Every structure is written in C-alpha cells, then in structure tokens.
Amino acid sequence: MADKITSREADYSQWYIDLVRSAKLADYSDVRGCMVIRPNGYAVWEKMQAALDRMFKETGHVNAYFPLFIPESFIAKEAEHIEGFAPECAVVTHGGGEELAEKLYVRPTSETIIWSSYKKWIQSYRDLPLLINQWANVVRWEMRTRLFLRTTEFLWQEGHTAHATPEESQEEVMRMIRVYKTFAEEYMAMPVIMGRKTDSEKFAGADETYCIEAMMQDGKALQAGTSHNLGQNFAKAFDCQFQTKEGVLDYVWATSWGVSTRLIGALIMAHSDDRGLVLPPKLATRQVVIIPILRGDKAAVLAKAESMAAELKENGIPAFVDDSEQNSPGWKFAEYELQGIPVRIEVGPRDIDKGVCIAARRDTLEKTELQLDATLAVQVSGMLSAMQADMFQKALRFREENTREVTDYETFKSAVEEGFVIAHWDGTAETEEKIKEETRATIRVLPEESDYREHYHMDEPGVCIFSGKPSSQKVVFAKAY
C-alpha cells in the first residue's frame, strides 16, 4: 500500500526502491547484484517487447539467438572493445570439472560472437544488408546496483547489422535511434532528446554513438537507448569482407543498437507518484479494474460488473473485475493505485439505478461519471487515450521547466543540481572530464533534432562555461543514472 512508500520529497532514492518492491515489480535476489523480475514487472517488459519487436520487423529486421559464452580470443580481437568492457566481465574458467583450455566470457554484449558468424555468412554484396536482432540477457559485473537501473544481469535486445556502404550503415543508425525515440514518446509517454554522444561517452569500439536521453522527476538524466555506428572496426577485427558489385573485396560496415529492462526504471521515475506506479495505458496489461460496491442486491451488482468487463474486452480494452469480499473498496482503490492500473471503475446499486458508474484516472485521480449504455467502451477508450497524451505533455512540461541555459560556471554548478543545463563547451575531452570531476555532471547529448536546437539556439557561437575558450555549439549537461 502507499503508506509503505517513502515520499519523493523525503528521499527520492528510497521512494523508488519502495515503489518497485511494494508494487511487486521486482525484488532483490540472493545472487549478489541480480534481481528477480516479478510478474507485474515482467508484464510491462512483455508489453515493451511486443511493441519494439513489431517496430523492428516493420523496419526489415529478423530475430536470431547467439551463444551466451564468448571465447577470450574473440573478445581480444577488438582492442578498444575489450578495454571498455574488461572490468565488467564475468569469466568462466572451469567446466565439466576441468580447467578450460580457453576462458569463456559471459556476454556483456554480443558484437564479437555475432561477427564471428557474420564472417561465415557474408561473401558478396548480395548477402547485404544483414539485419538481425537478438532478445537476450547480458552480464556486467556492477559494484553498485539498483533495481532495473543497474544490475549485474539484465534483459535487453541488441540489434547487429551489416551494410555495403558507410552511408547505408549511418542510415540504419539514425533509423533505429528514431525507432527508440518513437517508442519512448508514443508508448512510454516519455519525452526524450535524441542526439550524439561525445567521444568520451561513446560505446567502446564505435565510431559514433547516438542516444535518447530522458529527464527523471529528480532532474537527473537517464540514457534510455543507444545506436552505434561501428564503422569497419569489427569487420576488420574478424576479417569480414565481401565482394562489391564492382568485384572488389571490401570490409562491411556495421551498426549495433539496444535497449534494456532499464526502460522500466525510466518509466517508473518519469511518471509515478507517492501513491505508487503510474503506467501509460499502452504499456498496461490490465487497463481497467472494475470494483463492484457490494450493497443491496449483490448478485445484480456483480452481474452488471461482469457484463461491463465483457463489453470492454470485446472492444479491445483489457478489463477485469475484483469481486473479492475480504478487502474493502477503499483498500482496493489504494492497491490498484499502487499497481498503476490506468482506469478504475466503481459501480454500486445506486449507480445502476441511475444508469451510471464512476471512473477515475490513475494519473490525475480525477473522477468522471460515465453512462452505463452502449457507449461505455467509447467513453473508457477516450479516457485511456487522453491519459496517454496527458502523461506525455506533463513530462514534457516538467523537462522544459527544469532545463536552464547558463553562461557562467558558478551558475552552472548550482543549476545542474536541479535539472538539465544547456551551456557552451569548447569541444575538448579535458574540459569535459574536469567538469565531471568537479560537479559529477556529464555531457548527456549533442542534440540532433532541429526543433530542439532552434529552441535553445544550440548553434550560436559563444565561450565555454569552464575554460572560456571559443565554442561553436551548446550541449546538454546533467547528472545521470
């Protein structure tokens, strides 16, 4: 119940943990750094999977599955890649009671094992493009973990594609980061800034990394998805060449892109409140709960509630009836607010006599009187659509209200404690690192979207807030998860 949840104002971090556990989304495991995703949480992941998988297939991708274990020699082939991931890797040294001749890495990501197969499959330009996605688990040995946001093992999808030209691979990189942006905004109701990472923040082994960044309710950023242009780096490491249309051998051009169960953490922190989870309707497995007020003719009330649920389900709205008598209606209201059911409908004998029922939206808690007639499904569908749109607009307003443009470092240091900061940067890794050391803020993204760039005059020349050197553009700074 909500009384088990610390308020956001009192302790935001504890609020998040309390909510995840109280809403039965996830729990700690006896395995250090790992979590158990409970049915309520996994249901959200399944909705995310279904939407993303459909979007991947609509853009020409197919699913496959590659081994969990990666030979050490494969990892070592891409020097920058192994340098980036080595500290996080789990390594298998024994199997079948004997020491292995070659160590096996538990995948932190699958570029190397996948490219060992691509080398065998790609011979000619006729084999390209190769567009494959994998749904899998990965392991990164995290020292400081937090449910959904950072765990040693997590679930994700990773796309790996091969192309004949650098132009095609760059098109793929941008196509997929736009898919992620569409998913975040249209399904998660979470506004994101799409753009490029700095060289210091890009993926190990990539030429360029693009990302989507979202603002959480505490003003911190959360990287919600990435898409990497790998150039020919992995193709060269695994000698993956193809014969071009001109009959010349060339290395293929590659991309990789992924999102993970981290999105569930983002969803929670972007929308939820002190009463519990607030779920966008598009990601709710159960969109409507009907609570019969069992007074007077109980049988008639139950029959009406069941017929309402049936009507909603016939119209594509997942609804269910809670007719249990061991808990009061008030207890049920609080429990389903905690679980984030988008719409609650209560109906009793007086309501039936008047031909109405009372519906409440989870995001606003506002109550609305609905007519108990043939338009019930249309009325509820309208509530769900309005809720989805309103949640996005609320999150967008919050981001705008908590984004500041600053021109001096002293103001920057205080502003970055409260939200996103737009400021000039001289383009050097040295300045980027010094700002990070002093404030724990990082450059989250170099925005690509023209409307965002125009709104904040990102291309105006100026001077770097830290070094005072000339700067050709502004960037987005924030503290981050």
Swiss-Prot record:
Key words, A-Z: Aminoacyl-tRNA synthetase, ATP-binding, Cytoplasm, Ligase, Nucleotide-binding, Protein biosynthesis
Principal localisation: cytoplasm
Locations listed in the record: Cytoplasm
Chemical reaction(s) catalysed: tRNA(Pro) + L-proline + ATP = L-prolyl-tRNA(Pro) + AMP + diphosphate
Disulfide-bond pairs as recorded: none
Superkingdom: Bacteria
Broadest EC class assigned to this enzyme: ligase
Listed CDD domains: ProRS_core_arch_euk
GO cellular component labels: aminoacyl-tRNA synthetase multienzyme complex; cytoplasm
EC number: 6.1.1.15
InterPro entries from the UniProt entry: aa-tRNA-synt_IIb, aa-tRNA-synth_II, aa-tRNA-synth_II/BPL/LPL, Anticodon-bd, Anticodon-bd_dom_sf, Pro-tRNA-ligase_IIa, Pro-tRNA-ligase_IIa_arc-type, Pro-tRNA_ligase_II_C
4Fe-4S in keyword set: no
GO BP: prolyl-tRNA aminoacylation
GO molecular function terms listed in the Swiss-Prot or TrEMBL record: ATP binding; proline-tRNA ligase activity
Gene3D superfamilies, per database record: Anticodon-binding domain, Bira Bifunctional Protein, Domain 2, C-terminal domain of ProRS
Presence of keyword Manganese: no
Signal peptide residue numbers: none
Function: Catalyzes the attachment of proline to tRNA(Pro) in a two-step reaction: proline is first activated by ATP to form Pro-AMP and then transferred to the acceptor end of tRNA(Pro).
Subunit structure: Homodimer.
Similarity comment: Belongs to the class-II aminoacyl-tRNA synthetase family. ProS type 3 subfamily.
Comment text on domains: Consists of three domains: the N-terminal catalytic domain, the anticodon-binding domain and the C-terminal extension.
Record HAMAP family: Pro_tRNA_synth_type3
Name of the protein this chain belongs to: Proline--tRNA ligase
Organism: Chlorobium phaeovibrioides (strain DSM 265 / 1930)
Lineage, uppermost ranks: Bacteria, Pseudomonadati, Chlorobiota, Chlorobiia, Chlorobiales
Gene field: proS
